[in-house]
């Protein structure tokens, strides 16, 4: 990739973060999966980049792009954090078009000089290089959902087609999705309460769609559909999903997404339970 040969060592030293990709879609596709708010907070460490989007202090989405997904990943500090307009970033990443020409890849080099500086994007396709400068902002403190593995009560790993089926079959005109996890039947049940009445979808723990089932005790929790609907973007791209609930009823949906080069990235959604559960 020409972009990889355009900078010498001295030019590198001015940047605290440099990351390059031969195929920009390996980044843009994952970021689109969490694009339900305009702004995002970016955290970079030697392990890679985490991009976080939040809404109403009730839901948080994190996209993880591991360092080895990049052809080049150089970070000069222990961690680098900045806030950015995600809508503008995605527009820039697709500046050569969102529908790729067969056999043509858009290469990317991202450079960040540090606090107060813009995020520099160098995009190259077919010998044409475009430079974008995106203003960065003071990072806001993100929510700590304190989703500790020791407090996880139930965990199910599902092939994503099973959850896609649920979202297409259940009546989504209601306000909430109810998730029931039990050591006994129905094991794993999704319920909605819409205009056409109540609907349920059950997954036996020995179903071909269920890859793992761990349940310590029965839990029934409700989550606002308006908070969960943005996660369907990640669901559509994913091959597997890990569904976990902790002792407070908080929900974690972790989607495993395989990019065009066969590498794995993760998108995780945290959602707090709906406290307005009606009396049965």
Curated annotation (Swiss-Prot):
The keyword DNA damage applies. One of its GO terms (molecular function) is double-stranded DNA 3'-5' DNA exonuclease activity. It holds the Pfam family Rad1. It is found in: Nucleus. GO terms for biological process: cellular response to ionizing radiation; DNA damage checkpoint signaling; DNA repair; meiotic recombination checkpoint signaling. GO terms for cellular component: checkpoint clamp complex; nucleoplasm. It comes from the Eukaryota. Keywords: DNA damage, DNA repair, Nucleus. Expressed in testis, uterus, bladder, spleen, ovaries, lung, brain and muscle (at protein level). Expressed in brain, testis, kidney, heart, liver and lung. Its main location: nucleus. Component of the 9-1-1 cell-cycle checkpoint response complex that plays a major role in DNA repair. The 9-1-1 complex is recruited to DNA lesion upon damage by the RAD17-replication factor C (RFC) clamp loader complex. Acts then as a sliding clamp platform on DNA for several proteins involved in long-patch base excision repair (LP-BER). PANTHER family: CELL CYCLE CHECKPOINT PROTEIN RAD1. Belongs to the rad1 family. Component of the toroidal 9-1-1 (RAD9-RAD1-HUS1) complex, composed of RAD9A, RAD1 and HUS1. The 9-1-1 complex associates with LIG1, POLB, FEN1, RAD17, HDAC1, RPA1 and RPA2. The 9-1-1 complex associates with the RAD17-RFC complex. RAD1 interacts with POLB, FEN1, HUS1, HUS1B, RAD9A and RAD9B. Interacts with DNAJC7. Interacts with RHNO1; interaction is direct. This is Cell cycle checkpoint protein RAD1. The gene is Rad1.
